[in-house]
Structures are given as C-alpha cells and as structure tokens.
Amino acid sequence: MFIPLSILLLLGCSARINENRVAFDGFMFNSKLKVGLNKKDFEITVLRANRSLTGAKEAGRYEATIYCVNKFGTSDIAWILDPEDVSAVTSSNSIFIKGRCRI
C-alpha cells in the first residue's frame, strides 16, 4: 500500500511542476538568463531554437519579462538585442537576446 501511494504522490508532484511551464508556438523552450554587473542588465540564451524561431523569440521575451517583474516590479524593457531583430538560429541551435529592465 505504501509504494503505490508514494508513486501516486510523485506523479502528482511532477504534474504540478510542469503546469507552470509555458509553450511557445507549440514547443517548450529552456532559457538561460545571465545577470550583468548592474542587476538591471541581462542576457538570455534560448536553447533548441531550431524547433521554432518565432517560439524561441517569444520564450526569450517571456523570460526577460518574468525577470524584470520579479526583480524590479516592471515589465518595461530597453532591448539592446531585441528578439525581433534575431533573424536566424546560431550553429548551436540557440538564440541570444540582451536587454535592461527600465525602472
């Protein structure tokens, strides 16, 4: 009885983790955010962007917005390398964007 209950609880936990993920253009993207010396500055790499360039751009924009809202309470971003300016996926199947949270 204990083992089936444990398995059921673990399955429920993994479902909760995945419910917070957002799909863009039908795909889930992993992003890496690096913060600059000035905490307002950030760089984002979106991995596996070869699946959908449009989706990867939106995933990067989403990650940036979440960062700025959580750190500074605003979604206003000054783009240094705007997602809209990204026209191709790199050889490592990723895209790179860069910006600054405006406060």
Model regions and ranges:
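Sec-dependent signal peptide recognition
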Residues: 1-5
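C-terminal motif of bacterial Sec signal peptides marking the signal peptidase cleavage site
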Residues: 10-12
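Bacterial signal peptide processing site
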Residues: 14-17
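Alpha-helical assembly-interface signal, strongest on the long, hydrophobic N-terminal helix that forms
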Residues: 28-29
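Post-signal-peptide N-terminal segment of Sec-exported extracytoplasmic proteins
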Residues: 34-62
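Sec-exported extracytoplasmic/periplasmic mature domains
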Residues: 65-73
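Acidic helix-start/capping segments at beta-turn-to-alpha-helix junctions
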Residues: 77-93
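C-terminal edge-of-domain segments
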Residues: 93-103
